[in-house]
């Protein structure tokens, strides 16, 4: 048995280059101890993106220089898997406000998109900003929370203490859903999969039609 490759995975949504630099040092130690010449070194992914305003954007310039040095020193091919970093901020989920419900200390904006369409907020308590499609200068009275229609306590998206005035039938967009959006979606609660539209410059094309109930039940 001959080992030709080594693969590492150190985490996800990493916003500092330091863990990646440490990984290279660990790999060097492994190569020195085992004296194995790996033809392929898969450094994985994990490169984070800025979901929140205060998220630090990762700087990979110094890391890339170390990778180039590592590649030359050990004469190997380098593989990366930067999925989120490529597609994370390339997509939005456009959804409609179905109802407004007044709570004791906040207003609920119930959307027609739920955790079945976008799971990250329910699964990881992830933060995804919601942007009004049409902006106005009016302010909502008190806190506003965007939630979904699924009968689960985790079917919620984000709460704002200050937000513009929202009305029933308004459209809003959930941001940065390109990674782990469609791939984590499901038919939970007998909900059809939503349509997907790709926009290239001024042209839009449907790449997945909205699923109908008949095809859902015939699965």
Question: What is each model feature region?
Answer:
Residues 1-100, 189:
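Active-site loop/helix belt of alpha/beta enzymes
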Residues 66, 75-219:
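Charged (often Lys/Glu-rich) extended helix/loop segments that serve as interaction or gating elements
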């Amino acid at each position: 048995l001959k080992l030709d490759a080594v693969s590492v995975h150190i985490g996800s949504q990493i916003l500092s280059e330091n863990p990646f630099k440490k990984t290279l040092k660990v790999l060097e130690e492994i190569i020195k101890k085992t004296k194995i010449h790996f033809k392929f070194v898969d450094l994985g992914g994990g490169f984070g993106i800025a979901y929140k305003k205060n998220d630090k954007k990762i700087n990979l310039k110094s890391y890339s220089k170390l990778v180039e040095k590592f590649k030359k020193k050990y004469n190997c091919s380098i593989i990366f898997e930067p999925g989120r970093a490529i597609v994370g901020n390339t997509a939005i989920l456009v959804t409609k406000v179905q109802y407004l419900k007044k709570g004791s200390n906040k207003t609920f904006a119930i959307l027609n998109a739920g955790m079945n369409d976008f799971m990250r907020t329910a699964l990881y308590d992830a933060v995804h900003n919601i942007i009004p499609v049409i902006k106005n200068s009016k302010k909502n009275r008190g806190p506003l929370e965007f939630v979904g229609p699924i009968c689960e306590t985790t079917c919620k998206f984000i709460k704002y203490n200050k937000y513009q005035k929202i009305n029933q039938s308004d459209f809003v967009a959930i941001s940065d859903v390109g990674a782990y959006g469609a791939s984590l979606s499901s038919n939970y609660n007998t909900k059809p999969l939503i349509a997907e539209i790709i926009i290239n410059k001024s042209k839009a094309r449907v790449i997945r039609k909205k699923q109908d109930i008949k095809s859902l039940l015939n699965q």
